[in-house]
């Protein structure tokens, strides 16, 4: 038998001709954290079932890697969808609704089925049988027509419709012991390593809980974010009422000439929600003096703040917008991270004593000189920007630390109204493939950065992990402290953003480190029909990203 040598994780290894990545991975299980889920050669990811065809260096990824963790999740999903199909047949529609603290909330659409512990035990028991059997998960390439027939036979009309809009003539399905499913993204080679998971009854369905990426032998902690969950469930119900629950149904609105109506209904819903939040503030006007708005990157915070101020004025409340950016400490006092890099997202990067002192004076009705931060010199300046807030007027602050009480520690709790904003999309690719809220925000940011900040997509992707790490530390731990939550996602936006994002993503070469993410996003956007944004109103949050906003954003 012919053999050859390749460099695997820094070690020269002799492999047999025709060996797969899985064959080699068995000998390197101790080199990563948790089970190996994925391989990499040069700048391309490889599924473990694939044969090693080149002599390029090989790197293996365990679930501490985000791409490998996605593979693990999809592997557990096919265990679950097969189990439900085997237990109750094609009339039991399984829907993966959304992510909740990196767990997946799912429902089984079978009217007479109650999600009891007994039902969940049956599903999980089947799943663990498949794991114990170490069954292969096989990629099957077939004609689109054959894939649609399998989808219909297995009671998956969503996939049948999704494939209808697919441009390619072939489709890759994954087979697990005679059961077929479709997943957008890489899959495990077999079921044997998918040992750590659990099903937990939740709301009207159940959560699939996954391992902690840093400690893959145990489940990730779950703190039950009830406020965030209620927003997702409300959006899910609204999508069902609209008849646009997945990409195929969104594409259908385009082909039927109803896309403009969808835009107008989405925007009306946003306006209604913003008005409701303004009403909540108005009801507490005897105490509330400061409104704090916080949310992750590309949530549309600036446009939301402007629209909220308009709704407050409708109620006779005069708002005063204050930028937290103007309260940065001078550059030489900015905290640094472990690499010696200035960390502008650390709460101590803000002059908290000055901010609290100014807020107390404004609440007391004093005339206050507001600082302006000069980003060129890194110094604070005073340029005659003054505010004197009268009784009944509101101070509006927008920034990433708005929900953290440390920011406004000297302001009494009853004087503060906290708002969390994020793009929590409820639209799915199909019933088993959710759309990542993080990916949706990344696409927004790619479009905005290129349009208005002179950054190409590679630079945006390069810094995205730092952005999301900062959000995990500074924003998400405090989201349940919010008095109100605004979901800035729109059902229609990815059809519009597609035409702006795709050229930037295609510009990223295969030799660039950002290519892996770009390739994934290109494939994702390929599910959508492109739509013009001509009917989007100029006060829409989406205009903050594509241009044409009536606000200074």
Language model features by range: what are they?
Residues 50-69, 83, 92-101, 105-272, ...:
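Auxiliary tRNA-acceptor-end handling modules of aminoacyl-tRNA synthetases
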Residues 301:
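Conserved lysine of the Walker
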Residues 314-332:
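Short beta-strand-centered segment that lines the nucleotide-binding/catalytic pocket of NTP-utilizing
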Residues 329, 333-376:
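Conserved nucleotide-sensing/catalytic segment adjacent to the nucleotide-binding pocket
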Residues 356-414, 464-478:
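Glycine-rich phosphate-binding loop used to anchor ATP phosphates in small-molecule kinases
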Residues 408-553:
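Conserved NTP phosphate-binding and transfer environment spanning the P-loop NTPase/kinase superfamily
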């Amino acid at each position: 038998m012919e053999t050859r040598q390749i460099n695997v994780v820094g070690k020269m290894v002799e492999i047999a001709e025709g060996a797969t990545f899985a064959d080699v991975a068995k000998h390197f299980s101790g080199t990563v954290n948790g089970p190996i889920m994925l391989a990499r050669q040069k700048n391309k990811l490889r599924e473990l079932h694939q044969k090693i065809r080149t002599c390029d260096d090989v790197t293996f990824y365990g679930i501490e890697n985000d791409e490998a963790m996605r593979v693990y999740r999809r592997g557990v999903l096919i265990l679950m969808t097969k189990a439900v199909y085997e237990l109750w047949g094609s009339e039991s529609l399984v829907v993966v609704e959304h992510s909740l603290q990196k767990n997946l909330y799912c429902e089984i659409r079978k009217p007479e089925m109650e999600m009891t512990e007994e039902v969940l035990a049956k599903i999980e028991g089947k799943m663990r049988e498949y794991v114990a059997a170490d069954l292969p998960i096989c990629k099957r390439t077939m004609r689109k027509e054959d894939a649609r027939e399998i989808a219909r036979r297995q009671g998956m009309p969503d996939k049948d419709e999704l494939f209808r809009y697919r441009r390619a003539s072939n489709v890759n399905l994954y087979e697990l012991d005679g059961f077929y499913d479709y997943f957008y993204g890489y899959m495990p080679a077999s079921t044997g390593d998918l040992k750590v998971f659990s099903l937990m009854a939740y709301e009207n369905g159940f959560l699939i809980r996954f391992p902690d990426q840093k400690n893959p032998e145990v489940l990730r902690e779950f703190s039950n974010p009830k406020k965030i969950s209620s927003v997702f469930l409300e959006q899910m119900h609204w999508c069902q009422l609209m008849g646009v629950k997945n990409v195929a149904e969104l594409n259908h609105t385009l082909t039927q000439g109803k896309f403009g109506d969808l835009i107008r209904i989405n925007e009306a819903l946003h306006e209604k929600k913003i008005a409701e939040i303004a009403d909540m503030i108005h009801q507490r006007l005897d105490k509330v003096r400061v409104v704090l708005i916080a949310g992750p990157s590309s949530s549309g915070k600036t446009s939301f703040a402007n629209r909220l101020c308009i709704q407050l004025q409708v109620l006779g409340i005069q708002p005063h917008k204050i930028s937290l950016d103007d309260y940065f400490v001078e550059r030489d006092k900015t905290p640094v991270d472990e690499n010696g890099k200035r960390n502008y997202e650390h709460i101590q990067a803000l002059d908290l004593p000055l901010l609290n002192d100014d807020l107390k004076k404004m609440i007391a009705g004093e005339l206050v000189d507001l600082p302006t931060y000069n980003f060129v010199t890194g110094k604070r300046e005073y340029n005659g920007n003054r505010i004197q807030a009268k009784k009944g007027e509101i101070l509006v602050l927008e920034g990433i630390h708005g929900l953290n009480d440390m920011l406004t520690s000297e302001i009494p709790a009853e004087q503060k109204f906290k708002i969390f904003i994020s793009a929590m999309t409820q639209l799915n690719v199909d019933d088993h493939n959710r759309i990542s809220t993080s990916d949706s925000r990344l696409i927004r940011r790619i479009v905005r950065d290129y349009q208005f900040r002179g950054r190409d997509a590679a630079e945006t992707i390069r810094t995205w992990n730092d952005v999301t790490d900062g959000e995990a530390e500074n924003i998400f731990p405090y989201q349940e402290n919010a008095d109100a939550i605004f979901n800035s996602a729109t059902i229609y936006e990815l059809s519009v953003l597609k035409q702006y994002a795709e050229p930037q993503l295609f510009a990223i070469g295969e030799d660039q480190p950002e290519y892996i993410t770009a390739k994934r996003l290109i494939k994702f956007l390929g599910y959508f029909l492109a739509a013009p944004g001509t009917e989007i109103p100029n006060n829409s949050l989406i205009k903050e990203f594509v241009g044409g906003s009536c606000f200074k954003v």
